């Protein structure tokens, strides 16, 4: 059986990414702040601790994003909030033909979203499904890591096509962050979740 793993970054790219993270940390935190407990509790007006705001800026800087938001529940929580923020209950969402990750399926069901499936491995089929359902689809969820062993799609090409169609694109970047050269938002997606 042939597999198609994601292309991992090189050792040199990994080092450069680590330096980028350290640069972002030193731009957003002053000296001793890095070694402190941080600020415990919610700050009036920010509605979160100041330290959280700084960490969010570190993430945004690291991934060249306009903003970042830390949420509870790791990737699952991030996907839940992204779907809730970007789509309305009952909207149609484009997904890959493989099984949807179980915790993501719970959110899709809870929101009453209507999955429309396309084989992301076949760009022509993806284009056909987008054309056929152009008046229905409001957004798309693209998982960067492989869902099925035979998956081979180029998530960058999938995202580019979906953005051409004016769709809101949310990516599930779990298990891909810091391992691939670009996460979803760096490849043009509206929201990266991890």
Regions found by a protein language model. Name each.
Residues 13-37, 45-54:
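A structural motif shared across PLP-dependent enzymes of the aminotransferase-like
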Residues 2-13, 18-21, 25-26, 61-68, ...:
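Conserved PLP-enzyme active-site core in the AAT-like
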């Amino acid at each position: 059986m042939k597999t198609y793993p994601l292309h991992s970054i090189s050792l040199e790219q990994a080092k450069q990414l680590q330096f980028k993270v350290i640069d972002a940390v030193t731009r957003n935190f002053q000296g001793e702040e890095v070694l402190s407990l941080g600020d415990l509790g919610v700050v009036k007006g920010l509605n979160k601790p100041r330290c959280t705001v700084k960490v969010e800026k570190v993430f945004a800087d690291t991934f060249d994003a306009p903003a970042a938001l830390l949420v509870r529940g790791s990737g699952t929580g991030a996907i839940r909030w992204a779907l809730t923020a970007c789509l309305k209950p009952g909207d149609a969402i484009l997904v890959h033909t493989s099984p949807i990750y179980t915790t993501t399926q719970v959110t899709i069901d809870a929101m009453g979203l209507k999955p429309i499936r396309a084989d992301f491995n076949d760009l022509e089929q993806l284009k056909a499904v987008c054309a056929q359902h152009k008046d229905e689809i409001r957004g798309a969820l693209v998982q960067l890591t492989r869902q099925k062993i035979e998956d081979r799609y180029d998530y960058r090409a999938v995202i580019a096509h979906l953005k051409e169609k004016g769709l809101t694109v949310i990516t599930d970047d779990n298990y891909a962050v810091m391992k691939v050269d670009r996460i979803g938002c760096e490849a043009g997606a509206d929201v990266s979740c991890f």
